[in-house]
């Protein structure tokens, strides 16, 4: 078998038969078996040698690939009978060709691209090496933490004011909204006290009032809500006013200054058509009625006078307090007219009583205090009579006529003979002892007899103790003072805690 891989570019005569072609058109191969009996000797003109022909070679099988066939023309072909032989043995080129061109092609060139398989059997050929993907096996790691946010710039600390924080209910300093009144009220601190500046309908007006007061109280360096240049006119006016006077001016300008239908404080229009003046919240009372007046000004002046009497120069008035200097009593007179409101009952010394005071109307001395041991301890001191004598302006219970209680018994002041007789007998052993200061004595010039003690039954429990009796006896007035008091043309009631009650005196008389 001989494999011919040489193709003759020109001169190779091939005889193709269209019937012998394969229908697939992909590849053709034919194995030609030459037999000795059927083989013919090539013609003489085809050979270039004149020697006799040699015997034919043994039959050979030729494998021919159609893809290696050239496109030479078939003009030099012999007869149809010699097709198979010519295909097996190619004829030499014609004489007119100077040389024979042979082209050798490699079946599997090394530099050629990968061969194409006609049957497209991709699984029979190895694929060209492909770049392997970069596959890495990593251990499971926690997800990376997100980057921390950039640090926010810290706001600068607000300047701490010297006057405390701003109000929670208002954006202005010194202004607070009160739900009870429905107004914006302004206050300022001065010397540890909160000063009321007035109530206003708007927070802006209240802030203006605070700024004026702050400039007056603390100067131009005060912390205010608005610009200092807005208050140049106010600063010129406030130079001639004191703090109290300027506060009064601010209060009069406020909305909450006046109440009712009048523009003046403490003045309202009565249903009868006149103007009523009254002052509120004094000594626990809701208001104090001051009277009806024909004009608002008169009612306002009446209110101002009452406010000054009760609150002094710090009172809030409709007009300047200086306008009432000639109409109001002086401070010394007001202090002399003060009433001692200590809760205890004491009798002034006889030297303090004068006919002018005796001719006055009924006066009652009321003392706020306690009946506890403080008074009894004070009564044990030897200086108790001098202390009582040094207290001026006492109001004893004085009458120009003898009391009628001696003839008509009273449930609180019983006046029976047994009680008088028992009290006289109890007083006889101590003739030289001074009269107690804790007694209500009945003294009158119509009765030359010794003064009778009117016992009080509701003090019997505390007066029956021996300690209280001795204390009262040691702190009493002298006998001369008692005699002088009895010589006056008045009747004085004194309470004696040592005097027994009616029930105790009756029991004492029964035992005797």
UniProtKB/Swiss-Prot annotation:
Entries under PROSITE patterns matching the protein: AP2_ERF
Biased composition range(s): Low complexity: 42-51, 460-492
Bias (Pro residues) ranges: 141-154
Traits of the deletion mutant: Larger seed size and increased seed mass and yield. Enhanced expression of starch synthesis genes in seeds leading to increased seed amylose content and altered fine structure of amylopectin. Decreased proportion of A chains results in abnormal round and loosely packed starch granules but reduced gelatinization temperature.
Subcellular location: Nucleus
DNA-binding segment(s): 171-227, 263-320
Example GO biological process: negative regulation of DNA-templated transcription
Keyword terms of this UniProt record: DNA-binding, Nucleus, Repeat, Repressor, Transcription, Transcription regulation
Extent of Polar residues compositional bias: 21-32
Inducing stimuli: Target of miR172 microRNA mediated cleavage, particularly during floral organ development. Repressed by SRT1 via epigenetic histone H3K9 acetylation (H3K9ac) regulation.
Tree of life domain: Eukaryota
SUPFAM superfamilies given in the database record: DNA-binding domain
Main location: nucleus
Span of the annotated motif Nuclear localization signal: 159-168
Acidic residues bias locations: 78-88
Biased composition (Basic and acidic residues): 127-137, 418-430
Tissue expr: Mostly expressed in roots, seedlings and leaves and, to a lower extent, in stems, panicles and developing seeds. Present in spikelets.
InterPro entries: AP2/ERF_dom (IPR001471), AP2/ERF_dom_sf (IPR036955), DNA-bd_dom_sf (IPR016177)
Keyword hit for Methyltransferase: no
One Pfam family, short name: AP2
Assembly, per entry: May form homodimer. Interacts with TPR2/ASP1.
Family membership noted in the UniProt record: Belongs to the AP2/ERF transcription factor family. AP2 subfamily.
Function, in words: Probable transcription factor. Involved in spikelet transition. Regulator of starch biosynthesis especially during seed development (e.g. endosperm starch granules); represses the expression of type I starch synthesis genes. Prevents lemma and palea elongation as well as grain growth.
UniProt protein name: APETALA2-like protein 1
Primary gene name: AP2-1
């Amino acid at each position: 078998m001989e494999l011919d891989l040489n193709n003759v570019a020109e001169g190779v005569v091939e005889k193709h038969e269209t019937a012998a072609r394969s229908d697939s058109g992909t590849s053709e191969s034919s194995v030609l078996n030459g037999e000795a009996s059927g083989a013919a000797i090539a013609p003489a003109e085809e050979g270039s040698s004149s020697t006799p022909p040699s015997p034919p070679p043994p039959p050979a099988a030729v494998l021919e690939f159609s893809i290696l066939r050239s496109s030479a023309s078939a003009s030099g072909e012999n007869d149809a009978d010699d097709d198979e032989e010519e295909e097996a043995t190619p004829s030499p080129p014609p004489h007119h060709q100077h040389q024979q061109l042979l082209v050798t092609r490699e079946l599997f060139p090394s530099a050629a691209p990968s061969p194409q398989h006609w049957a497209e059997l991709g699984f029979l050929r190895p694929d060209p090496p492909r770049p392997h993907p970069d596959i890495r096996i990593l251990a499971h790691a926690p997800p990376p933490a997100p980057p921390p946010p950039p640090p926010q710039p810290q706001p600068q600390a607000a300047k701490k004011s010297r006057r405390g924080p701003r109000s929670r209910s208002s954006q202005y300093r010194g202004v607070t909204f009160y739900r009870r009144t429905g107004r914006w009220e302004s206050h300022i601190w001065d010397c540890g006290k909160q000063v009321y500046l007035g109530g206003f309908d708007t927070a802006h007006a209240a802030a203006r009032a605070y700024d004026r007061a702050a400039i007056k109280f603390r100067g131009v360096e005060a912390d205010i809500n608005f610009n200092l240049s807005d208050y140049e006119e106010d600063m010129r006016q406030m130079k001639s006013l004191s703090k109290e006077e300027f506060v009064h001016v601010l209060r009069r300008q406020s909305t909450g200054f006046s109440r009712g239908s009048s523009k003046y404080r403490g003045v309202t229009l009565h249903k009868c058509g006149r103007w009523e003046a009254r002052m509120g919240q004094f000594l626990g009372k809701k208001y104090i009625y001051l009277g009806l007046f024909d004009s608002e000004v008169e009612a306002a002046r009446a209110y101002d006078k009452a406010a000054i009497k009760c609150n002094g120069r710090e009172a809030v008035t409709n007009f300047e307090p200086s306008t009432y200097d000639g109409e109001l009593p002086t401070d010394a007179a007001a202090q002399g007219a003060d009433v001692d409101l200590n809760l205890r009952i004491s009798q002034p010394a006889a030297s303090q009583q004068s006919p002018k005071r005796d001719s006055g109307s009924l006066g009652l001395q009321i003392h706020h205090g306690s009946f506890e041991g403080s008074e009894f301890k004070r009564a044990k001191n030897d200086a108790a009579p001098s202390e009582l004598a040094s207290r001026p302006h006492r109001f004893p219970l004085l009458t120009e006529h003898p009391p009628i209680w001696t003839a008509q018994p009273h449930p609180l002041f019983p006046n029976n003979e047994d009680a008088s007789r028992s009290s006289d007998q109890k007083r006889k052993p101590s003739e030289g002892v001074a009269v107690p200061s804790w007694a209500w004595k009945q003294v009158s010039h119509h009765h030359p007899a010794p003064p009778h003690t009117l016992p009080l039954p509701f003090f019997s429990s505390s007066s029956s103790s021996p300690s209280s009796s001795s204390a009262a006896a040691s702190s009493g007035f002298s006998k001369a003072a008692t005699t002088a008091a009895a010589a006056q043309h008045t009747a004085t009631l004194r309470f004696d805690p040592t005097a027994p009650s009616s029930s105790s005196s009756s029991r004492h008389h029964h035992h005797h």
